[in-house]
UniProtKB/Swiss-Prot annotation:
<keyword id="KW-0813">Transport</keyword>
<feature type="signal peptide">
    <location>
        <begin position="1"/>
        <end position="20"/>
    </location>
</feature>
<keyword id="KW-0732">Signal</keyword>
<dbReference type="InterPro" id="IPR030678">
    <property type="entry name" value="Peptide/Ni-bd"/>
</dbReference>
<dbReference type="GO" id="GO:0015833">
    <property type="term" value="P:peptide transport"/>
</dbReference>
<dbReference type="InterPro" id="IPR039424">
    <property type="entry name" value="SBP_5"/>
</dbReference>
<dbReference type="GO" id="GO:0043190">
    <property type="term" value="C:ATP-binding cassette (ABC) transporter complex"/>
</dbReference>
<dbReference type="InterPro" id="IPR000914">
    <property type="entry name" value="SBP_5_dom"/>
</dbReference>
<keyword id="KW-0762">Sugar transport</keyword>
<dbReference type="GO" id="GO:0030288">
    <property type="term" value="C:outer membrane-bounded periplasmic space"/>
</dbReference>
<dbReference type="Pfam" id="PF00496">
    <property type="entry name" value="SBP_bac_5"/>
</dbReference>
<protein>
    <recommendedName>
        <fullName>Periplasmic alpha-galactoside-binding protein</fullName>
    </recommendedName>
</protein>
<comment type="function">
    <text>Involved in the transport of alpha-galactosides. Required for the utilization of raffinose and melibiose. Probably acts as a periplasmic substrate-binding protein for a transport system.</text>
</comment>
<keyword id="KW-0574">Periplasm</keyword>
<dbReference type="GO" id="GO:1904680">
    <property type="term" value="F:peptide transmembrane transporter activity"/>
</dbReference>
<keyword id="KW-0614">Plasmid</keyword>
<comment type="similarity">
    <text>Belongs to the bacterial solute-binding protein 5 family.</text>
</comment>
């Protein structure tokens, strides 16, 4: 086994020879086959109903210290009274290492910083899985990576079941009965309706992860039937695709009994006061997730403790989670990989290829504290051009002229032909990791079809010819093309490229694009912003081009499907409606919209597969995005943890922190360390500092 592992590592580090592309460079062709990748983990596929169920058990258990220090002292009701009528039960047969034991910590390292805890109003908690551990959603999709394709539907979560009307236009959702927020307040339909009516539908509020009314279908409505029942009404029949949008991160309700105290509709405050009413220093915010924030030290650490009212159990009735505490060390994203490999951190999504080689070397050592498992090539980067020609983002005259170019197919072809994707990939990491990616769907999704993926091979001279065709020539001899004399005084074409400065991969790709576009004759300048500012600029339409790491719709197709095209005024990443206006879609975009809407409405698997072939061909032929590179990610996890699913991708329906189902991850008793900062303590009252004994 050791020899095999070392040989596999050696083959990855050495790499493989490049393949030849036999085609006339100026002609579109099918994208080249990707190099084989021998280290990809194998997934064990299961049926959807083998993962969990809802039912009452004869008895329930909790950590002994909770019983002794809190229940017997009268500080908490008995565990059976804290659980819902029928808790969610994770089936032992789907747990790789079976039912676990209580104790220990999972130590995360992140590069983000928390704005506050108001997820519903758009505040980030710092990413890295903090929000995933705190906020639960109506449905759940991350574990679906292991579900057989013909059984693909979201898992129940806060919504334990749902029924369709005979005509398929109404969906009745049954919520878990008797579940409670972490402060003991009941969870019910009022929390769901507050999120929908006073956050998603309120145009002055922008929930984190971008939920809009269109996310759930144009004209969709939601109403409360009773305390534990809500009813959706859709314009189309049986739009099962919207069940995926009810998972992370677009339908994860917050605690209405707390949030209403700051919302303008109920408290007479401003929207800014609502958004910022629960800053990072506000501890013990009630959650439905497995862990509650109890400590925060700026630029140091966030600590979360187990939720005593968590509504999930194992088959023996042990209240989850098994892990008592989560740590989030506030550092950098690159340091996350370093600490996970070194053993001072416990988990990392190895998504920055610059760290691949060193991580492989260290993980190959028998004494390494962490194991490293690669998944499919689902980490991809596109360059998105701003397609709005009618004012999204209030562009000035220069930006308007650039957008006019962006809407020209020959210009887009010139740009994509000028991209040397092989060099971009090798600048990140050498070896069989990166692959040529022309844009469109990820090669890691089951809907990917190579023969439908059109590729314009690298051809700098052909690209320059296309620039001349659209009227761009270097008229002043400085190496950069100029606008025609009648536009902006014939000055140099200057394009601003938006990029996230928090990630080295994003920066490296952006810098590579600046150099490659300079050879084409386009002056590209970087607008490097931290993650929060970069996202704000994106949502506001303040960019010409932007580097964008692919989100779930490209990796899974069934998650966030409306975002594959401008199906609504605020669904596309690079083409949205201006305030009070409409999206001025181009002909190829209308084709994409029609295809995506048909896909959402269809329940025929063969038809859906064919529709995504059409989508891929239209998107890549028309250069809807400029694909840059694609590569696999690897899950780095400390060897002391059990119940890590084999082959778990770091990103498909969601990130690995959700994919591995952290609430059922455990550390065997003989492997547990002394890492808890607040042992035998539970969250205190909302707004009070720290946990309680």
């Amino acid at each position: 086994m050791k020899t095999h592992r070392l040989n596999m590592t050696a083959s990855l580090l050495i790499g493989i020879s490049a393949f030849a592309v036999q085609a006339f460079a100026s002609e579109p062709t099918v994208v080249p086959e990707q190099p084989p990748f021998p280290a990809q983990g194998k997934i064990t596929y299961v049926s959807r109903d083998s993962i969990l169920e809802f039912k009452a058990l004869r008895e329930y258990r909790e950590p002994e210290w909770v019983t002794e220090k809190f229940v017997k002292a009268g500080k908490l009701p008995p565990v059976a009274e804290r659980l819902p009528k029928e808790p969610m039960v994770f089936k032992a047969g789907n747990m790789p290492d079976g039912m676990g034991v209580y104790g220990d910590v999972m130590r995360h390292v992140i590069g983000g910083r928390p704005e506050g805890w108001n997820y519903s109003a758009g505040q980030t908690q710092g990413w890295g899985g903090i929000d995933i551990g705190m906020f639960e959603c109506l449905t759940r999709t991350a574990p679906l990576f292991q579900v057989e394709a013909d059984d693909m539907e979201p898992l129940p979560n806060l919504a334990k079941s749902w029924d369709w009307s005979e005509d398929g236009r109404k969906l009745t959702m049954h919520l878990i009965e008797g579940a409670k927020w972490s402060d003991g307040d009941p969870f019910d339909a009022d929390d769901v309706m507050f999120y929908w009516e006073d956050n998603v539908l309120d145009s002055s509020v922008s929930p984190l992860n971008g939920a809009t009314p269109e996310t759930f279908g144009e004209g969709t409505t939601l109403k409360k039937i009773d305390q534990y029942t809500v009813e959706w009404t859709f314009k189309e029949a049986f739009p099962r695709q919207h069940l995926f949008a009810m998972a992370y991160g677009t339908f994860c309700p917050g605690p209405s009994h707390i949030l209403k105290t700051k919302h303008p509709k109920y408290a007479g405050t401003t929207y800014n006061e609502y958004k910022n009413g629960f800053p990072a220093e506000y501890m013990n915010l009630p959650v439905m997730g497995a862990w509650v924030p109890v400590a925060y030290r700026p630029d140091d650490i966030i600590v979360l403790r187990r939720n005593p009212y968590y509504w999930k159990v194992d088959e023996a009735g042990n209240q989850l989670p098994y892990l008592n505490e989560l740590h989030y060390k506030l550092s950098t994203w690159a340091d996350r990989d370093v600490q996970a490999i070194a053993g001072s951190g416990d988990i990392s999504n190895l998504e920055q290829p610059e760290n691949f080689v060193e991580s492989l070397k260290r993980a190959a050592n028998e004494s390494a504290p962490a194991r490293l498992a690669f998944g499919p090539r689902v980490i991809g980067y596109n360059m998105h051009m701003n397609f709005s020609g009618n004012g999204w983002g209030d562009p000035d005259e220069r930006a308007k002229a650039v957008r006019e170019l962006n809407r020209n197919l020959d210009f887009r072809k010139a740009v994509t032909m000028a991209v040397d994707r092989k060099k971009l990939g090798e600048a990140l990491v050498k070896g069989p990791f990166t692959a040529i990616y022309p844009g469109g769907l990820s090669s890691g999704t089951s809907f990917y079809d190579r023969n439908s993926t059109i590729y314009y091979p690298h051809d700098l001279e052909g690209a320059k010819v296309l620039l001349e065709k659209v009227g761009l020539k270097d008229t002043d001899g400085n190496g950069f093309v100029n606008f025609p004399a009648g536009k902006l005084g014939g000055r140099d074409v200057e394009i601003v490229l938006l990029v996230n400065s928090d990630y080295s991969t994003d920066r490296n790709l952006a810098e590579g694009m600046v150099g490659q576009m300079e050879k084409l004759g386009l002056r590209v300048v970087l607008n490097a912003l931290d993650g929060k500012q970069r996202d704000a600029a994106n949502y506001a339409g303040r960019f010409d081009w932007m580097i964008h790491r692919n989100t779930a719709e490209f990796a899974s197709v069934v998650q966030n499907t409306p975002q594959l095209a401008p199906t609504g005024p605020r669904t596309s990443w690079h083409h949205r409606a201006p305030e009070g206006g409409e999206v001025d879609v181009m002909p190829h975009e209308q084709e994409l919209v029609d295809i995506v809407n048909k896909f959402i409405a269809s329940n025929d698997n063969d038809e859906r597969t064919e529709l995504m072939k059409q989508y891929q061909k239209v998107a890549t032929t028309n250069v809807d995005t400029v694909g840059l590179t694609e590569y696999p990610g690897a899950l780095i996890i400390n060897k002391r943890f059990s119940n890590i699913p084999p082959g778990a991708p770091i990103f498909m329906f969601n990130w690995a922190e959700d994919t591995i189902i952290r609430e059922r991850v455990f550390v065997a008793a003989d492997k547990q360390g002394d890492y808890e900062l607040y042992p035998e303590q539970l969250p205190g009252k909302p707004g009070e500092s720290g946990p309680i004994n």
